Amino acid sequence: MQLLKKRILQDGKCYEGGIRIPFIARWPGHVPAGTANDHICAFYDLMPTFCEIIGEKNYVKKYANKNKEVDYFDGISFAPTLLGKKKQKEHDFLYWEFNETNQIGVRMGDWKMVVKKGVPFLYNLATDIHEDNNVADQHPEIVEKMKTIIFAQHTPNPYFSVTLPEKK
């Protein structure tokens, strides 16, 4: 008898054990029972999804924080996926920052980079879901592309600081 070792995903905010969570929906007559999909979404996709479902087309203007000069709505509705439709817009990348662990995360397709205290670690989630093998040295072009995303997405904040990777 062969015993299978159950492996737990790494925890820590930007690792899969901290961000990979199932989304479960029940909506009789709309969401087909027993369906599953591999659509990747983020917390910030919830508002556009629910607004699309209720028919609110102008939610950015209606719900923007009036106390802010700029309020960001970066989410993409995943209502088409919930409703079983084929056309679903997807993110080019997902981006996270966690100041309490000094981590930044970027995901593009199967590639995921975690920057811990300024040091980049690159993983291919298609072959390494547990994020055991840092392949940053083997794929410097992907690391640089993801660093470009980090520098474009990061907004400095004195209350929530993270250490950015070195610029090339």
Tell where the protein language model's regions lie, with residue ranges.
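C-terminal cap/loop subdomain of S1 sulfatases and analogous C-terminal strand-loop tails that border
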Residues: M1-E16, H30-T35, H39-L125, P156-F160
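Intrinsically disordered, low-complexity polar regions and short flexible loop motifs
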Residues: D128
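A broad, structural surface signal
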Residues: P48, E52, E144, T148-A152
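Short glycine- and hydrophobic/aromatic-rich loop-to-beta-strand nucleating segment
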Residues: F23-A25
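Conserved nucleotide-sugar donor-binding catalytic segment
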Residues: R20
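Active-site-proximal N-terminal segment of extracellular/periplasmic enzymes that hydrolyze or transfer
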Residues: N133-E141
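Carbohydrate-binding/catalytic loop surfaces
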Residues: K167-K168
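Charge-dense polyanion-binding interfaces
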Residues: K147-L164
